[in-house]
Amino acid sequence: MQPSFMTMNELIVFALLLTPLLAARQQSVPGLLFSYNLAPGIVKYQDKYDNAQLPQDDFLKVAKDLISQCHSETYVFVNQPGLSRSDFKQHKQSMHKLYNYVLTSSTTVKFEKIDIVQNDDIYEELIAYTMDKCNIDDKIDIGGNVTDRYQPFVEARTRVLRVDFPPLPQQGQYVEGIGTRKDVLQANDEYLRYVMGTLPTPKHTVFYMSLEKSEVPDTETSLSYDIWPEIFTNPQRKVEIDRNDRVAKEMPKLVPYRPRIDTEDDKYLTVLDQEFIDNHYGIIVLIIGVTIAFILLQLGAVKVKKPSKPQITKDVTKEKKTQ
């Protein structure tokens, strides 16, 4: 029985050693929150939770603080299952539409380690809060199938959109008919651009994250991936200004009419202009001389060619007198 007892102990020890390794493969999910309009007081959370484990309750507090300002006309909740921090670096080019939306937003924060509770759909809680807090009646669920298109809306009513993409393939995996992880991220990025392009106005607030923890290769668990540091470590992002307030600033008073060509300093040329006469005296004299000579020649030609009265008339007159 001793060998069997030792074997059982070895199994227990092996299981205890294996458990941390398996847990190391479970990633806290990354998340992006960005808004077209300025949301005062949100940027402070970036410094407070940057690179720190963010409990789900704290994340919900930040999200509701952003939502409660009710300054957007569309609230978009994007769920990308399987998203990891490494995707923002390794597949940045496949997410360049999302990158541009974040870059041009007035308010944007990122959380790299959101510790969500598995199988807890926090989007439903946030959507319910949004609709209640901002008095929104319309909610649209989009399956996230990039081959499908939904009917765009043109009414200027505040809405909530939820986009649920299918899970991403694992790193290095190729799925028939879908492609690699890079291919799927790029297709989803284009679909997100399509969805955002159907919005009646650009005044949106977007939540982009994975609602489930993903597994990554062991080689990635020890690596540090910052989400687009060129954006989020830029000191100008610490300043709370509305980067998209151009319309309000560029529509004040009416601009007075101004011709394309400014003729205010134009000078009108005349033959009596002294400067013109001084600069072109020789040419003017030559033109006048040629003109006078031409006139004289024409008068002389007329005089030379003038026909004399016919003598035959005089003879007829004399004959009449004789008779």
Swiss-Prot record:
Keyword Transmembrane listed: yes
Domain of life: Eukaryota
Signal peptide: 1-23
GO biological process entries: (1->6)-beta-D-glucan biosynthetic process; cell wall organization; fungal-type cell wall biogenesis
Bilayer-crossing regions: 282-302
Glycosylation sites: 145
Any one cellular-component term (Gene Ontology): endoplasmic reticulum membrane
Keywords: Cell wall biogenesis/degradation, Endoplasmic reticulum, Glycoprotein, Membrane, Signal, Transmembrane, Transmembrane helix
Topology relative to the membrane: Single-pass type I membrane protein
Lumenal side: 24-281
Cellular compartments annotated: Endoplasmic reticulum membrane
Residues in the Cytoplasmic compartment per record: 303-323
Protein task: Required for normal beta-1,6-glucan synthesis.
Family: Belongs to the BIG1 family.
Protein name per its UniProtKB record: Protein BIG1
Species name: Kluyveromyces lactis (strain ATCC 8585 / CBS 2359 / DSM 70799 / NBRC 1267 / NRRL Y-1140 / WM37)
